[in-house]
């Protein structure tokens, strides 16, 4: 391999995940960290470590100059951005490549295209992906907006062209609200992302969030690794993910998988990507593409046996895809619980010292986490501290194993979301697989959370 030393431009469990894949390939690792993460597990385990700034992300994990300097002084020949932070920053990818450092990610132009939600929708349509009815591009004129909304049919949703996470999104149920809500969505988008551009789509009543994992070699070859169901969400943030989806048939998987793989091949896409759809009444509607590794990638690894991070590194190194589409078999069922350092019912962050820690174990149980007893969870970053991934031959068997694994997980000191997951696993709707993206918030409201 040409890659001998890899800089990990991230923190937490994903930094550790990348380190593990690199070491299994005989590649040295460089950890970059803020002062708040000096004692983090990935920093302890890496072959080299460089402090790149104070705790605030803008001064450390988003500090492009500091990261490039760290790569140069440690002679790193590749950078893996993980997820979040700079992972979908096309300018950063260009700067990395301009410094003759291998970028472990898609081509910068594809990151840029898919990062602009309007351009992404246009591109997806041109590639043959099914779209939600709505505007072809940005909407600024109220009369035009009313005509689009009438054609799509109320209710409609107004969305920010840049960013996500629920900011700059407004649901409109009638023409009289439209102008006000467009202004509100634009203001929110401007404040959050520096871009007031918005567009309009048909608002689906009770959809599921289904996403397909794709991989391309950048040379016109691409595969899909099936779907994940990420419908259990709170405020547009995923809580639990499973693969395969309880509602997608093998025929649907093959049909949509073929469509997304062809789209990526036609695009010349390189590396890992996720194409997200809303699914309702048997129909798929493209919402966005993430040009990076996803938090929930382990459930796909569990049912396919493909190491996605290893594949990312191989492709960035110029090697072909290690598997062909016909080699991929979908076996069994996997569920991931995101364990956050927060109150399980109020969702208030709960940073601080971990006084004791014991990871669940046993057959087909995986825990991705950098926690250890005595570690202090910093208050500056995302609250996710661990991912519990469980595999079973059937969905029912997987759920039973997950219940057992959650009983075994011990994290004392901070409050965690473990009790939330335990409660979810007793709910008839979850057990039957009958839930939509609205289900979790409605369930929490009924509980008074």
Which stretches of residues belong to each language-model region?
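Alpha-helix initiation/capping motif
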Residues: 60, 85, 113, 138, ...
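Active-site neighborhoods of enzyme catalytic cores
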Residues: 155
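ATP-dependent carboxylate activation and anion-phosphoryl transfer catalytic cores
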Residues: 2-3, 8-25, 49, 72-74, ...
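Conserved beta3 strand of the protein kinase N-lobe
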Residues: 134-135
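ATP-binding N-terminal substructure of ATP-dependent carboxylate-amine bond-forming enzymes
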Residues: 1-127, 139-147, 397
């Amino acid at each position: 391999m040409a890659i001998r030393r890899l800089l990990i431009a991230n923190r937490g469990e994903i930094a550790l995940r990348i380190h593990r894949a690199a070491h299994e390939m005989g590649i040295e690792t460089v950890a970059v960290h803020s002062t708040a993460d000096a004692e983090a597990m990935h920093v302890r385990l890496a072959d080299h470590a460089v402090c790149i700034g104070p705790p605030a992300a803008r001064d450390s994990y988003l500090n492009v100059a500091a990261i490039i300097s760290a790569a140069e002084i440690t002679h790193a020949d590749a950078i893996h951005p993980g997820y979040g932070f700079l992972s979908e920053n096309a300018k950063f990818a260009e700067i990395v490549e301009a410094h003759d450092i291998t970028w472990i990610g898609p081509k910068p132009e594809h990151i840029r295209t898919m990062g602009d939600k309007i351009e992404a929708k246009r591109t997806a349509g041109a590639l043959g992906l099914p779209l939600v009815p709505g505007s072809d591009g940005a909407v600024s004129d109220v009369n035009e907006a009313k005509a689009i909304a009438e054609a799509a049919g109320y209710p409609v949703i107004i969305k920010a062209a840049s960013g996500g996470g629920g900011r700059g999104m407004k649901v409109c149920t009638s023409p009289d609200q439209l102008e006000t809500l467009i202004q509100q969505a634009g203001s929110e988008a401007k404040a959050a992302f520096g871009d007031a551009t918005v567009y309009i789509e048909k608002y689906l009543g009770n959809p599921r969030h289904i996403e397909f994992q794709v991989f391309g070699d950048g040379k016109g070859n691409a595969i899909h690794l099936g779907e994940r169901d990420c419908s259990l969400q709170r405020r547009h943030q995923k809580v639990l993910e499973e693969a395969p989806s309880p509602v997608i048939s093998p025929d649907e998987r093959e049909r949509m998988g073929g469509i997304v793989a062809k789209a990526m091949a036609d695009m010349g896409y390189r590396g890992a990507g996720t194409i997200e759809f809303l699914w309702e009444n048997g129909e798929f509607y493209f919402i966005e593409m993430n040009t990076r590794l996803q938090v929930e990638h382990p459930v796909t690894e569990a049912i396919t046996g493909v190491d996605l991070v290893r594949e990312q590194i191989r492709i960035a190194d110029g090697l072909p895809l290690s598997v062909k589409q016909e080699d991929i078999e979908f076996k069994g069922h996997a569920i991931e619980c995101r364990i956050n350092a927060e109150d399980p019912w109020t969702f208030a962050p709960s940073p601080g010292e971990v006084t004791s820690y014991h990871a669940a174990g046993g057959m087909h149980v995986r825990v991705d986490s950098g926690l250890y007893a005595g570690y202090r969870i910093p208050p500056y970053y995302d609250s996710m501290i661990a991912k519990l991934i469980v595999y079973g031959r059937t969905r029912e068997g997987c759920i039973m194993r997950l219940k057992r694994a959650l009983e075994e997980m011990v994290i004392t000191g901070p409050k965690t979301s473990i009790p939330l997951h335990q409660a979810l696993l007793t709910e008839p709707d979850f057990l039957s697989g009958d839930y939509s993206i609205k289900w979790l918030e409605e369930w929490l409201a009924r509980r008074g959370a």
